[in-house]
């Protein structure tokens, strides 16, 4: 699986993901709008990881084939837990995880 990290996704996460990972910066796609970025990413990647929680409201994702994973935070210690799920994404997935509620001890 080939995965693209959006701007804002901590690059150290790539070492924990069992997939080939590139970043928007490395691809020289930093200036693309969300719609252009998703179209370009879909032509070359299987998955897209972002921190943009508004993406699903800003873009029509219904026809997208690329898997999209929205991270709930950029805090590195919390992100390691998401590496397995990112590597296991399937075509067309849209996964948006929330952080666990720290007040809920159950």
Locations of regions flagged by a protein language model:
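N-terminal first-folded block
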Residues: 1-44
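Short secondary-structure boundary segments
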Residues: 7, 51-53, 72
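Short active-site-adjacent structural elements
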Residues: 14, 57-60, 77-79
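Residues lining hydrophobic/aromatic ligand-binding pockets adjacent to catalytic sites
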Residues: 32-39, 59, 74, 101-106
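Acidic, metal-binding active-site segment of PIN/NYN-like and related structure-specific nucleases
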Residues: 41-60
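Glycine-rich loop at the start of a catalytic domain that most often binds anionic cofactors/ligands
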Residues: 61-65
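C-terminal structural segments of small proteins and small subunits
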Residues: 67-105
């Amino acid at each position: 699986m080939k995965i693209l990290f959006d701007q804002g996704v901590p690059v150290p996460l790539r070492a924990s993901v069992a997939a080939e990972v590139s970043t928007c910066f490395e691809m020289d796609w930093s200036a693309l709008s969300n719609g252009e970025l998703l179209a370009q990413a879909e032509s070359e990647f299987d998955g897209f990881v972002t921190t943009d929680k508004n993406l699903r409201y800003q873009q029509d994702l219904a026809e997208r084939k690329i898997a999209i994973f929205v991270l709930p935070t950029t805090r590195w210690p919390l992100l390691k837990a998401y590496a397995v799920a990112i590597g296991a994404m399937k075509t067309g997935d849209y996964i948006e995880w929330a952080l666990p509620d720290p007040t809920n001890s159950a």
